[in-house]
Amino acid sequence: MLERLENCEKRFREIEEEISKPEVINDARLVRTLAQERADLQTKVEMYRRYKAISKELEDTKNLLEIEKDEDMKDMVRGEIASLEKSMADLYTQMTLELLPKDPNDDKSIIMEIRAGTGGDEAGLFAADLYKMYTRYALLKNWKTEVIDINGNVAGIIKEVVFEVNGKGAFSRLKYERGVHRVQRVPQTEASGRIHTSTATVAVLPQVEEVDIDINMDDVRVDIFHSSGAGGQNVQKVATAIRLTHIPTGLVVCCQDERSQLKNKNKAFAVLRARLMELEQSKVDEERTESRRAQVGQADRSEKIRTYNFPQDRLTDHRIGLTAHNLPHILEGYLDEIIDTLATHEQTELLKGED
C-alpha cells in the first residue's frame, strides 16, 4: 500500500509542475483535467506525508529512548512512543480506506422508485410511509426532491411513486435502501388487533446525463394521454401525460405530474436513461450492481433487506444483523445512523478483499 501512496505523491508533484507550464495554462480543457486529477490525489498525498512525518518522529523518539538515562524521562518517552504508534495505526487505516475503489456513481443525484408489494392497502400505506421517510431524509440533507410519477389516492395509499432526489452524494447514501422492505403492524382497520405483514420495494438509480447513454429514438414508442390526476381545465383540454415504451427491453416509463407535456417528456426520458444505464451496467459488472429487476426482487414476504416491527418498536436490517429502535424517529427521516453502519460494513468487507 505504501508503494501505491508513493506513486500517488510522485504523480501529484508531476501535476503541480505540469499545471504551471505556459503551454498547459493556455489549454483550458487540460487544466481542468489536471486540476481534477490533483484534487483526487490531494487527500491521499496529505495523509501519506503526515504518515511519513509521524514515522520519522517515531524513529527519532525511539532513538532518544535508547540514550536516555533518567527513568522518569524514559517513562515520558515511552508514553510518547505509544501515542505516535497509535497515530500511525489510525492513519494507516484511514489511508487504506482512502485507497479503496470508489463507486463512480456515489456523487450523483438519484431516481428513487417505491412500489407497494404484498399486503393490499396496508402495503400502499407502508409505501407512503417510506416515501415520507426518504423525502424527510432528503430535507435533512438539504437535497431537493421532485415527483416524476405517482399512483395513489386520497386515503394516503401509494401504489407506486417515482421521484428525483437531487443533491451531491445522494446515491452514496441512499443506495443502501434498495431492496424489499417489510412492515409488521396492526392496521387501524383491524378490530381484532391481529398483526399484518406487508412489503414494499425500493429501487435507487443514479441519474444519467444524456451524453452518458445513447437512446435510439426509433426504439422508443411515445404515447400521449390525459392525466389521471386532480383534473381541471388543463386535463380536459390538453393531453399532457407521457408514456415511453423502450421496445428492445420492454421498459415502460410514465410521467404525468407536470402540467406541461414537454416537462413530462423530459422527466420520463430521464427515468428511461437511468433504467437503461442500470441494465447496461449490470451486464458489464454483475458484482458491483445488479439488474433493476434483481434489485427490487419480487416483493414477496420471504425476500427482505429490512423489517419494521411496530409492536416491538424495532427495525432490523437483515443484511448485517443491525437492530435499531424508535421507529417514529426513523420514519421522520433520521436514517444516518443506519446508513453509516451499512457504509462501515461495506468498507470492512472491501478491506477484507484488499488483504
UniProtKB/Swiss-Prot annotation:
Key words of the record: Cytoplasm, Methylation, Protein biosynthesis
SMART domains: PCRF (SM00937)
Cited InterPro entries: PCRF, Pep_chain_release_fac_I, Pep_chain_release_fac_I_sf, Prokaryotic/Mito_RF, RF-1
Protein localization: Cytoplasm
Residues recorded with modification N5-methylglutamine: Q233
One term under GO cellular component: cytoplasm
Post-translational note: Methylated by PrmC. Methylation increases the termination efficiency of RF1.
Domain of life according to the entry: Bacteria
Primary location group: cytoplasm
Pfam name, any one: PCRF
GO terms, molecular function: translation release factor activity, codon specific
Main function: Peptide chain release factor 1 directs the termination of translation in response to the peptide chain termination codons UAG and UAA.
Family to which the UniProt record says this protein belongs: Belongs to the prokaryotic/mitochondrial release factor family.
HAMAP family named among the record's database cross-references: Rel_fac_1
Protein name: Peptide chain release factor 1
The organism's taxonomic lineage, starting at the top: Bacteria, Bacillati, Chloroflexota, Dehalococcoidia, Dehalococcoidales
Gene (name only): prfA
